[in-house]
Amino acid sequence: MMLMMLPFIGSVSVSESLVAMTTMCLVYLILKFFQTEIPEGLRRLPGPKPLPIIGNVLGLGSKPYLSLTAMSKRYGHVFQIQIGMRPVVVLSGTGTVRQALIKQGDEFAGRPDLYSFRFINAGKSLAFSTDQAGVWRARRKLAYSALRSFSTLEGTTPEYSCVLEEHICKEGEYLIKQLNTVMKADGSFDPFRHIVVSVANVICGMCFGRRYDHDDQELVSLVTLSDEFGRVVGSGNPADFIPILQYLPSAEMKNFLRINEHFTEFVQKIVTEHYTTFNKDNIRDITDSLIDHCEDRKLDENSNVQMSDEKIVGIVNDLFGAGFDTVSTALSWSVMYLVAHPEIQERLYQEIEDKVGLDRMPLLSDKPNLPFLEAFILEILRHSSFLPFTIPHCTTKDTSLNGYFIPKDTCVFINQWQINHDPELWKDPSSFNPDRFLSADGSEVNKLDGEKVMAFGMGKRRCIGEVIARNEVYLFLAIIIQKLHFLPIPGEKLDMTPEYGLTMKHKRCHLKATMRARNEH
């Protein structure tokens, strides 16, 4: 996080810097003087002693999820650090997190009013907005309903399908052809480069009813912007934690604004096109579904929450922006793990061959018959923990947790990485072992163990796209494992070191893939 301070150096005069530092020192001393009183019967939060102005930033390092996990061993599952001038409560341990986000869900359902969050989707993002009142709930419910209507099977047998499945099957088939072509031409491929475009095409199909060529510059540009967005948000903006910096010029913040404006312009253009071709009797995609709902609400005089055209753009922007980063990261990591563990890759292929066969594509309805694949995905989410934290929460009122007093409007970090690597919860947590989720005979996934994995948050702010994301990861993997055998490049070491961000990516690399013998054309 200290690295994020660097863009300010050199862009501000010495006199401006001195004024800013003096102001921050005065504010810090005033805040220390008026320190919150602790109600009788409760304790003050433990935690490391902060430095003036910068707080505990130096102690977080480049991998804050590891640093905060180490701190939890010393201070417990509820402790406080200070980032810049903002107090932050860090929660770990599955029992503590469930208590906060489920049993005391209303008290921890807020989002902190971070400066950078105000510019995400014009401050009206479902995921980042501080709002949690009626309008926010109505928009969240509407977005969830629209997602479900295009991604839910009406039955559990192969003859049933849904829009999500159709798009994944189409893109999965194209991805296999694309990788085969690249392998013949270049001898290797960048897994992230091709997977992310395929996944982006699925959400484009769901939201906009269109797909793009893998080399389409507009789509490639948006994918790149999404990657930048995750990096900036994950690193933390200094102005979020030292308010005076909001008024100083920042190249990084200027770039962040550009990213968000580009996303909004892209979605606005497509939503406008949908309005001109909208037909109530032919709902083509999620955007049409939202427009239809909006028109119905405008005609309904008794409706408590009117949905403006601007809010439709906001919802679609949210769904599109979040619709491919998590899934593409999960799939890219999955391919890396397949290469790192060839014996597991072979078991997965054998399961698909035995339960699905090789004469047709796997489908969503096959999922219950592929328990080892489901266990593999759970172990990917747990072991990689590429979503190390949830988006920060915030307390909505003065509250307490585990006997500690937490004031209203306190920023709260949920350390998902710690939960997924807690030795009290997992046997040998550092080892990659999908079998940990299977029943003794390997015939089914232990649901209780699966629910221990934390990747999509919990409670009122839980990711609305979780079910879709899990289904998408499952079906893409089943399709490519059935057709392709992934291999490392001879002589090159596979680097599984994560790079920190909102979603942690592996380092870009190249791999090899061959068509399975019975799938050769």
UniProtKB/Swiss-Prot annotation:
Record localization: Endoplasmic reticulum membrane; Microsome membrane
Residues that coordinate or bind heme: 463
GO MF annotation list: heme binding; iron ion binding; steroid 17-alpha-monooxygenase activity
Topological category with respect to the lipid bilayer: Peripheral membrane protein
Keywords: Endoplasmic reticulum, Heme, Iron, Membrane, Metal-binding, Microsome, Monooxygenase, Oxidoreductase
Sequence similarity: Belongs to the cytochrome P450 family.
Protein name: Cytochrome P450 1A1
Gene this protein is translated from: cyp1a1
